[in-house]
Amino acid sequence: MFNSAEIIETITMIEHEHLDIRATTIGINLMDCISEDIDKLNENIYNKIVDKAGTLVKTAETVSKKYGIPIVTKRVSVTPIGSIIGSAIKNLEQEDAINCCVEVGKTLDKAAKDINIDFIGGYSALVQKGMTKGELALIESIPLMMKETSTVCSSINVASTKAGINLDAVKKMGEIIKETATTTKDALGCAKLVVFANAPEDNPFMAGAFHGVGEGDAVLNVGVSGPGVVRATVARLDNKDIGTVCNEIKKTAYKITRMGELIGREVATDLNIPFGIVDLSLAPTPAPGDSIANILEEIGLERCGTHGTTAALALLNDAVKKGGAMAASYVGGLSGSFIPVSEDAGMIRAVNDGALSIDKLEAMTCVCSVGLDMIAIPGKTPASTISAIIADEMAIGMVNKKTTAVRVIPVPGKDVGDFVEYGGLLGTAPIMPVNEYSSEEFINRGGRIPAPIQSMLN
């Protein structure tokens, strides 16, 4: 039996501390959609998505109402399009191949809108060791695809611990991000584009979600959200030692994750598809108090970004994993604390106060999930500098055998001190300064940075 205190605690978490299910994401395998005819490919993709995920929104809302727990977004991820587009464009010139990729993106967008989901991920390519013609066409189509769609998210994996860093792909992505910024209002397309090292195959969070080739035909993955709950827990621990803080965070993470497991399994059962994983990531929102930065400040930092921030984030990340792992049958995805600047009111304040820089954020990514996220930079930033920022973050992931990523937004016409307003979960992004010294010669060398010695595990 539950006692009254536990019931009141749960109500408080939901009503006042922003506890919710951030994402219910159906992963769909599109390998059986492959065709040499682009029209047939698009038809197959559309039909498969509608068949597998057509009732996701209705089912999620029914379960949400049953338990009184908000499910914020309903999403779909698909097999990386770069892996299935090749047959349809193998005999086409590059420009025609690019246009075909855009048509597939528009098919994904139409399917997403017709089944009323929020986002669809998987306009992706895995190019950590090299690029096929289809993958190159897909990458080069991203700016136009973002212009023509509103729900499609794109992710490109350019590095891994086993393969090293594909510097040619890193250079290309700097150019693509720069171009995407000019094709969409306030560079919004860049907010739906992420560059990965060691990308997971079962990630429920956008913009990096795709359905890995090792996955089954369909699966439901869940991402929880509870920074406000963790912050409230830490706020009650005045003058307690750090071990006590860690232990209380673990207990809270356990409760949050159990909720995610419960909701995820029920939605999956009602949809008649297998349940996959719970992603243990703490995902902030722009709402007051629902902030990773605020948790770190409750732990004892005057402002997120000051000395000690990396240590505080490391203990938070570890405690969340330990508590969450006990509560879930299967853990996957990114599973760590997210630090997206524009989506976290505490991070925005830290940037405005001069406490938080891109360099400090890079250090923080060494101990958490997932990377340099939702960072707006001056529109004049050269593509080579964006590529170099990506290369640095990929190196952290490659060497430390972890997932890292970059979602950076060069906003045309904006400079340091300006803001760009996206609204909703994407929030408000202050324009952050980048190092003005050039990395162009390094990026132009091209080739592949070899895998580190720690990749040799056998």
Curated annotation (Swiss-Prot):
Coiled coil: none annotated. Gene3D superfamilies: 3.20.70.20. Pfam families: DUF711 (PF05167). InterPro entries: UPF0210. Belongs to the UPF0210 family. This is UPF0210 protein Maeo_1412. The lineage of its organism: Archaea, Methanobacteriati, Methanobacteriota, Methanomada group, Methanococci.
